[in-house]
């Protein structure tokens, strides 16, 4: 869960009261999940995808005040949306909620099925007897992944020796071949001699009562490695985690490391926060994160917690590194292609219907499409010949006399980057052949 500046709102809650957000799942469209947010002044926080027997379960944090509920402690609860085909979705009311006054937030976690029982592990944010904020581990069980019952003691695990009590959250659960539960917990070390003390705690238990603290999966991180995800895919093990909201991953041929840095960090970009993934049919993996809101609704302002769901499909390269693409089921239907008015400069030669060549050795060459509808899906094919600094689009560029107007999308073969407005993906290889640029 990303730490972002926010204004605190204050609530008075009696000891017997439940914290409730005005979320009515029945009113949400079953046809919309890509870029979904709940109706009204509600938002999506960290996503927790899970796959079981043909159903993709997308648990997500229901955010009602950009993390500022309950004196800034979050007031988050787990909501759920499910699908068997990624096209039609069913939205459920809160499945793990705040039921007690001491529960200040039901934080991020993970789900596993063992012996036909769903186990949801999560952190509960609370105020301890000394008035300090702590994060402690809780879990709930369910026969169907929808109706959960919290288990006692709650919390069942308060802290690991040598690690932070304030930052002890986001447990990722896996069950090994012997039936042991493994939890990977976001925290920081108390003994680090530098400020790079972020660590991924590794807990193991057979009975969910006695827990052994194993060697941490990673240490020496600049920040708490949040919202971990972990899975095996075609002989590679992946550890995914967030730092400052952005998503990073490591890969290994061994279950718990040592880890190697991938050839590219395909999940690291500023417009999607803390991505996690789950299996899907036919060996696929579908990832989900959230697009952060911005202060005052302006993209050039800073991030605030909570936003819209974003879903992508992961692909695996020959070296085990990960890439992303659009899941075909989630690409929206469109009307037939339009033919907008074209305004071109002297560097442009029209080759045929919707086909152009730009020759601009001395600077920028461009042509414009006039009166493009506000909501459009834009795709194009391009072949780059010779050294080119960059190529791309200016989106929603309403004034050609102002270079800074609009959103600049650019691919740079020279710098090996792809950028959109204020976020950049690195290690981009542009082949010497026709490539297709698409969006969804």
Give the label of every model feature segment:
Residues 239-242, 247-324:
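Extended catalytic-interface subdomain
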Residues 70-76, 129-135, 192-198, 242-245, ...:
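Short, solvent-exposed loop/turn segments at conserved positions within beta-propeller repeat blades
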Residues 21-22, 31-36, 268, 282-284, ...:
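Extracellular glycan-recognition regions
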Residues 55-58, 117-121, 179-183, 236-238, ...:
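Entry beta-strands of beta-propeller and related beta-repeat scaffolds
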Residues 83, 140-142, 203-208, 252-253:
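Conserved Ser/Thr-centered positions that define the repeating blades of beta-propeller domains
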Residues 63-67, 125-129, 188-192, 244-246, ...:
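Short glycine/acidic-enriched loop and turn motifs that connect beta-strands
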Residues 19-48, 67-71, 87-113, 146-175, ...:
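Surface loop/turn signatures of beta-propeller and other carbohydrate-active proteins
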Residues 1-20:
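Bacterial Sec-dependent N-terminal signal peptides
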